[in-house]
Design a protein with these regions (language model features):
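Membrane-interface helix-loop junctions in multi-pass transporters/channels
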Residues: 2-138
Length: 138
């Protein structure tokens, strides 16, 4: 491929990584659909058991894979992006929140971790309410 300008270079360099991230995200989305459906079928839908199971399992996977990919086996940025942005991002974004908060705690940033916890929960619930109210105006 002949690269004519910086945009071509950027597109050429990142396209394979983006494709792998997208495929991993597709797999994560299918896993989320399957697991949340299986749990909801088993335990009912009076409580969001399926979502809770996906979020909890996603956090477990995020912690384990973070250790394995950063501490035990050094993996390439593309593989890490596939796993954390693609697979786990498609599976649950709550795992990103959990992993980022854990990293702050591990690095001794207790105040930032607490701010992240409070802001994510308060802002998240508040913005769901705002979105609900705004949609009701349409």
């Amino acid at each position: 491929m002949r690269v004519g300008n910086i945009r071509d270079l950027v597109n050429y360099a990142f396209m394979p990584r983006m494709i792998w991230i997208g495929l991993a995200g597709f797999a994560g989305t299918l896993l989320r659909y399957w697991l949340s459906g299986a749990v909801a079928k088993r335990y009912g839908e009076t409580f969001p058991y399926g979502t809770l199971a996906v979020n909890a399992f996603g956090c477990l996977l995020a912690g384990a894979l973070f250790y394995l990919m950063y501490e035990r086996f050094l993996t390439s940025p593309t593989v890490r992006s596939m796993v954390f942005i693609g697979l786990l991002g498609g599976f649950t974004t709550f795992s990103s929140y959990g992993l980022q908060t854990f990293t702050l705690l591990r690095d001794g940033e207790l105040l930032l971790a607490l701010i992240n916890i409070a802001a994510s929960n308060v802002a998240g619930l508040f913005l769901v309410w705002i979105g609900y109210r705004l949609a009701g105006l349409v």
